[in-house]
Amino acid sequence: MSEISAEERESGTVFAPKFDSDGLLTAVVQHVDTREVLMVAFMNADALDATRKTGIAHFFSRSRQTLWKKGGTSGNTLAVSQVLVDCDQDAVILLVEPAGPACHTGARTCFYRELDCGALQDVRT
């Protein structure tokens, strides 16, 4: 992607994602209705493109070094309602309608534990 000015990046209308040195940007995934944070993942240009084209969240697996469609195996897809872009265009929030649990453990959200006095406590309700 071509470089744009800081002013255009921060206040303009040109979408020019600022990927890190590994070609990734952070994606925070929130439930469209409750705004609960469901997960955090990474997107490369291909994942961002696939998400925009299909309306289903796609991410880049750093461990497997491959593109993956969330819910491709489990069926627990994330239908993207809106993509919010931060001021630096190096992170996005995906507002989604989940088709099931967001976490691979089966939990509704990947954030189901709280750090309390040095130990993790389950906070699922």
Curated annotation (Swiss-Prot):
Signal peptide: none annotated. Gene3D superfamilies: Phosphoribosyl-AMP cyclohydrolase. Pathway: Amino-acid biosynthesis; L-histidine biosynthesis; L-histidine from 5-phospho-alpha-D-ribose 1-diphosphate: step 3/9. Coiled coil: none annotated. SUPFAM superfamilies: HisI-like. The keyword Transferase does not apply. Pfam families: PRA-CH (PF01502). Keywords: Amino-acid biosynthesis, Cytoplasm, Histidine biosynthesis, Hydrolase, Magnesium, Metal-binding, Zinc. It comes from the Bacteria. Its cofactor is Mg(2+); Zn(2+). It catalyses: 1-(5-phospho-beta-D-ribosyl)-5'-AMP + H2O = 1-(5-phospho-beta-D-ribosyl)-5-[(5-phospho-beta-D-ribosylamino)methylideneamino]imidazole-4-carboxamide. Binds 1 Mg(2+) ion per subunit. Mg(2+) binds at residues 86, 88, 90. Belongs to the PRA-CH family. This is Phosphoribosyl-AMP cyclohydrolase. It comes from Erythrobacter litoralis (strain HTCC2594). The gene is hisI.
